[in-house]
């Protein structure tokens, strides 16, 4: 496999052009996706504590994963010049079992690598980065097959994917900033209650926590409209390049070249 240096600015420009020509509005699809995720988050917040609360939290997390798969599949269709309706968001239900299994297995491997040190955990996360894309493209493959394909596809591209994420970090930080601030305040007050018995406030800035959570979710939705479809489409461009140069998936290439992020491993 020969990897190549990907022209990131060009990929972003091409993604923007593709999204402008999409037959179904990317902003409309993003708004629907983020609104559904926000609704699931609020449902989880209403679930309370105890067994029922845990069950609702797990269920909403799984549903969010299905919606995320559907959004990526929409972006895949955009890159192919195909029409993908709003119902594409729910296409992940057709292979939800494999989707859940893939998340569990990759999370398990990443946790194992993270136990060695922080950096191996990060590298492992990038090693399995394309596994979900392989599964979305071909739901007939097995979970371990998707993971193995991703391991071969990401050889030579982990560092480039890391730089890609850094290039969108400002947008991600902007989208999550209000939620991070609210979470920090809530964590601080809960700690004070546990240690010193000081009751945690039920409101912040004169508003109930649930209302603030809703406001933070709307903020995240609005910011996501500005960058999220482009980010996914650019990530898919990297995936397509990795498939072509690795010969795994579509295309074929010569023998492998390794970079410093790609030491062979026997675990995951």
Map each language-model feature to its residues.
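Hydrophobic alpha-helical membrane segments
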Residues: 1-268
């Amino acid at each position: 496999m020969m990897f190549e240096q990907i022209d990131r600015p060009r990929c972003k420009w091409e993604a923007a052009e593709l999204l402008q020509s999409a037959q179904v509005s990317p902003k409309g699809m993003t708004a629907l996706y983020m609104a559904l995720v926000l609704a699931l988050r609020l449902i989880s917040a209403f679930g309370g504590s105890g067994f029922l609360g845990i069950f609702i939290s797990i269920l909403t997390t799984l549903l969010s994963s299905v919606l995320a798969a559907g959004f990526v599949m929409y972006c895949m269709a955009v890159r192919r010049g195909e029409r993908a309706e709003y119902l594409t968001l729910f296409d992940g239900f057709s292979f939800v079992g494999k989707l859940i299994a893939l998340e569990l297995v990759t999370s398990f491997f990443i946790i194992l690598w993270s136990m060695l040190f922080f950096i191996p955990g990060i590298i492992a996360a990038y090693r399995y980065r394309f596994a979900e894309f392989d599964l979305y493209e071909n739901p007939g493959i097995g979970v371990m097959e998707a993971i193995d394909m991703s391991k071969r596809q990401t050889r030579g591209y982990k560092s480039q994917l890391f730089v890609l994420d850094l290039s969108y970090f400002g947008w991600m930080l902007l989208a999550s900033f209000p939620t991070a601030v609210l979470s920090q305040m809530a964590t601080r007050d809960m700690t004070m209650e546990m240690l010193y018995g000081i009751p945690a406030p039920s409101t912040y800035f004169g508003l109930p926590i649930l209302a603030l959570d809703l406001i933070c979710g709307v903020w995240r939705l609005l910011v996501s409209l500005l960058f999220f479809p482009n980010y996914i489409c650019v990530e898919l461009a990297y995936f397509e390049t990795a498939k072509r140069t690795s010969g795994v998936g579509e295309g074929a290439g010569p023998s492998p070249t390794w970079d410093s992020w790609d030491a062979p491993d026997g675990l995951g």
